From Swiss-Prot:
This is Ion-translocating oxidoreductase complex subunit A. The chain crosses the membrane at residues 5-25, 39-59, 65-85, 102-122, 134-154, 171-191. The gene is rnfA. It comes from the Bacteria. It is found in: Cell inner membrane. Its EC number is 7.-.-.-. Keywords: Cell inner membrane, Cell membrane, Electron transport, Membrane, Translocase, Transmembrane, Transmembrane helix, Transport. Signal peptide: none annotated. GO terms for biological process: electron transport chain.
Length: 192
């Protein structure tokens, strides 16, 4: 049980997919200007990332490995992710039309979010079992959500701040992301 907790903590804080592995930077920079959009994107990504992790594990274990189709792994994972994202998009559209409009193009872009595919592929390369795959996917999603929401809150404050002209917009956002990454480096010794 403790190894599962360590896997979750290390995935969320120590090996954060955005700040350490630099995966998922497109939605990180694109959706983080408003807190409401960031929270919606976080919920959608958490659902997609966790479900895609589990389904990718099942496809790999029960379809690709028995039939020796390992060379189709990346393509099949992309297909699994696309199906999960389409399902999520339909679910969000039915349950919250305002969130669906707020997320706009970023919801279908979860399909091309490299963090989702990265987690699925890392689950296989690190030889996680079913439970570890689910925890790893959920931890990656929680880490992504944590960073996205924190960064979004900081960007909203920066929009109201008196930032020098050359640093406005993307420049101050990149500086803030770098400082945030340095802050997360403090968790490095937390899990061995």
């Amino acid at each position: 049980m403790s190894e599962y907790l360590l896997l979750l903590i290390s995935t969320v804080l120590v090996n954060n997919f955005v700040l350490v592995k630099f995966l998922g930077l497109c939605p990180f920079m694109g959706v983080s200007s408003k807190l409401e959009s960031a929270i919606g994107m976080s919920m959608a990504t958490t659902f997609v990332l966790t479900l895609a992790s589990v389904l990718s594990y099942l496809v790999n274990q029960y379809l690709l490995l028995p039939f020796e189709l390992g060379y189709l792994r990346t393509m099949s994972f992309i297909l699994v992710i696309a199906v999960v994202v389409q399902f999520t998009e339909m679910l969000v559209q039915k349950t919250s039309a305002s969130l669906y409009r707020a997320l706009g193009i970023y919801l279908p872009l979860i399909t091309t979010n490299c963090a989702v595919l990265g987690v699925a592929l890392l689950n296989i390369s690190e030889k996680h079992n079913f439970i570890e795959s689910a925890i790893y996917g959920f931890g990656a999603a929680v880490g992504f959500s944590l960073v996205l929401i924190l960064f979004s809150a900081m960007r909203e404050r920066l929009a109201a701040a008196d930032v020098p002209l050359p640093f406005r917009g993307g420049a101050i956002a990149m500086i803030t992301a770098g400082l945030m990454s340095l802050a997360f480096m403090g968790f490095t010794g937390l899990v061995k």
